[in-house]
Amino acid sequence: MAKVLILDQSKSMRNTLRERLEYEGFSTEAAEDEEAASNMCEKIPFDVILSDTGCKIPDKGVPFIVLSSEASIDSAVEAVRNGAQDYLTKPIDMNRLLQSIHRTIDDPAPVPCLLYTSDA
């Protein structure tokens, strides 16, 4: 069973993603902020991290997918340059998210950066 960390500042988004992913057979953990996510990554070997654009990704070599409420080409390019495996806009198309998670877990590309942040 693949382990997914959901890092999002919105409690409703964390809960929605968690419910759906667990229904689909994933094991999930959810974190509201970078500190909680980093602590979880110390204890649990995640297969993928789903992250809101405003959150920094813990440097654990785990592939990540950015979930953004900002639908801009610049934001997407920045995310990919910073190592994101994919960039999806909110509201999330769950079928596309599931495809992205499976693709990332089945064939993860090397994560070339330490963390992702959208401080631009």
Question: Could you describe each region identified by the protein language model?
Answer:
Residues 44-50:
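Active-site beta3 strand of CheY-like receiver
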Residues 116-120:
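Conserved small/polar residues in nucleotide/adenosyl-binding loops
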Residues 92-101:
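C-terminal output helix
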Residues 25-34, 40:
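Short hydrophobic/Thr-rich beta-strand motif most characteristic of the beta2 strand and flanking loop
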Residues 102-113:
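The C-terminal output helix
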Residues 11-29:
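Two-component/phosphorelay signaling modules centered on CheY-like receiver
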